[in-house]
Amino acid sequence: MKIDHIAFAAQSLDQAHAYALQRFGVKLPAGGKHPLMGTHNLVTRIAPGIFLEFIAIDPEAPAPNRTRWFALDRLMQEGKLEDAPLLFGWVASLPGLARNAIESPQHELLEVSRGGLRWHFFHRKDGEAEAGGCLPAMIDWAGGNSPVDNMQDVGLHLNQFQLAHPEMAAIRAKLDGLGWDAACPENRYVAFADAAQPALTLVLDTPNGRVQIEGGGV
């Protein structure tokens, strides 16, 4: 298992565009639409094998018959996305996800599409992050082919993605149980820390210099 992408929840893609331009000095490329969830996104490569995603409710899409992923319904209802996008969590790539995922009353395995892309996605049914964002949702791209290599590099480069939690030993044990490969080049960007509360820290090198963003725990 390895890190696949890091996700921000946004009020809208217009907000995400403005945020990226102000904080990073870049214009984010369009991704596409997710009919199953009624969402759309912006995506950009930030390291070999890793991309950054800003996701928002698609105002042109019909409301889905399920809770949207990345807690977008709750975050919008509570007004937590009014000021700026939130660093929500991350997604890990796990080959064979459809064979190995264990569904439960709290979790579900979905078949998802965006344009010509197809993938399996495993997450909490209520759309919330696991362990304040320290544990990932999981993805398995059809054919094992992540779209990251075809994504535009706009000058955002991942320096570090830190996971902090009061029970970090348990978090790491769960990741190890899922097959976390510490030697994988992508996973070397991920750091672990003890903390009083769950938190995420994303450090990016950007045209505006090095930028540190705090999030998680939402």
Residue ranges and their predicted role:
Residues 1-3, 9-27, 39, 46-218:
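Glyoxalase I/VOC metalloenzyme domain signal
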Residues 27-34:
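Conserved catalytic-core motifs of GNAT/GCN5-like acyltransferases
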